[in-house]
């Protein structure tokens, strides 16, 4: 179970549904089991990387039309988190190629507390917005980043 449609207005993509660069190498990422509504799922815990790149894709046919969705990622910065003083790029790309992009610095976020990282908002309204919805979170600067845990990416009305 890597994604879960909780209702027609709430959709979750768990970390295993994402493409996380270096996630198959235990020197950089580890997978922590968590219970979610009786399902055994995993959070992705970053040990350290310099090339931080996380990508998710969902088909908009899984979403309800003419409903505004708020897209966010659950993140926790551990007590030893560091290297987050350069901006992360957040992108939400619609099937028609239109993009929402922003940047965020995580260095000053509270430690050991889950928070929502806002990715954007969207509405699936017609054939131009039907297809693959792509969400990205990345920073390719060479400084080492460590100590973040990724939870689910949520699309909720």
UniProtKB/Swiss-Prot annotation:
GO biological process, one term: defense response
Ribosomal protein among keywords: no
Main location: secreted
InterPro entries in the record: PP2-like, PP2-like/Lectin
Localization: Secreted
Subunit structure: Homodimer.
Name of the protein in its database record: Lectin
Organism from which the protein derives: Coccinia grandis (Ivy gourd)
Classification of source organism: Eukaryota, Viridiplantae, Streptophyta, Embryophyta, Tracheophyta
């Amino acid at each position: 179970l890597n994604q879960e449609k909780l209702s027609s207005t709430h959709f979750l993509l768990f970390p295993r549904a994402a493409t996380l660069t270096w996630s198959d190498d235990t020197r950089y990422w580890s997978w922590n089991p968590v219970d979610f509504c009786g399902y055994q799922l995993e959070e992705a815990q970053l040990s350290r990387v310099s090339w931080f790149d996380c990508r998710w894709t969902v088909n908009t046919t899984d979403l309800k039309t003419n409903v505004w969705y708020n897209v966010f990622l659950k993140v926790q910065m551990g007590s030893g988190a560091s290297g987050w003083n350069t901006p992360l790029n957040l992108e939400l790309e619609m099937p028609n190629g239109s993009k929402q992009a922003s940047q965020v610095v995580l260095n000053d976020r509270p430690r050991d507390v889950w928070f929502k990282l806002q990715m954007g908002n969207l509405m699936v309204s017609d054939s131009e917005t039907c297809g693959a919805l792509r969400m990205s979170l990345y920073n390719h600067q060479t400084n080492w980043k460590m100590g973040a845990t990724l939870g689910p990416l949520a699309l909720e009305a």
